[in-house]
Amino acid sequence: MKQVKKRNGSIADFEERKITEAMRKAFEATYIPTSDEKLQEMTATVVAQIETNFPTTTPSVEHVQDYVEMILMKEGYLTVAKHYIVYRYEHTKIREKMQEEVLEKIEENALKIKTRSGREVAFSEDSVRKNLMRFVKGYENDVDVEYILSQLKYEVYEGMTTDEVHKALTMVVRSMIERDPAYSKVAAKLLLHRIYGDVFGPDYKSDNLVEEHARVFARNINRLVEEGNLDTRMSEFDLDKLGRALVIENDHFFEYMGLEIMSSRYCMEDPKAKLTLETPQMLWMRIAMGLAIAEKPADRERVALEFYDVLSNFYST
């Protein structure tokens, strides 16, 4: 099980350790001893039950908590299960109260978020709507912008950064992909914007992407060669020529899940800053160069471009 559906319908990564910690706290609160081994065993049982009953769909947080209750009772820990049930009820009330307060602040234009510079500004639904419409362009008849905004309100909180708001917006749109394929395209656009922000800086200009791609692509290849992470022959390619051959528009061929998998698993990342270092087209070209590296030096760029054309246009899928 890799994902779970949150209470507002958005999708989040499933974290098994949270089940273990929730049960541990319930045992500690009732002063009933247990062991790490027993907690791990019960956690594994909960996960197995969920995977059996949700083979093709995503379980909700409530489903996960229901199975925790059942396992605790089945194991005979009735006092612990009772505490866990009360805990769930009390925290539901707390969440509802907090959500009410956030919604009131939004209505009063009093909810503060932080810009990249650290400056506090009021969260503006109108500003988010205007920004979102840039990504919805072309799918206006298929995407419910007002519903997305209504769900986003349950994700924002006091002191949230503008980057976190963008990520939350992406997650809300992602959770709606099952409604219409258009949501996958919009979510991919939102994710692509974050990737570009990581690679080129948060203030990148969309009308300068060709130049920026060429510059950063050459820098990345040379850096990897210098660090010993790439074959030295990679720096012998005409990097400026290959960088300028990148077809930026092909980034929009991606659906959300494909782009998310590529960016999180295969694109280079700065381990310290936790920032993505290359765009999808840069990755395709880097792979194409690797495939062409054994060619005669005079043929390498030509062959690399041929491989890139196949990869970038999804001809091989």
Predicted regions, residues:
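Extended catalytic cores of very large enzyme megasubunits
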Residues: 1-317
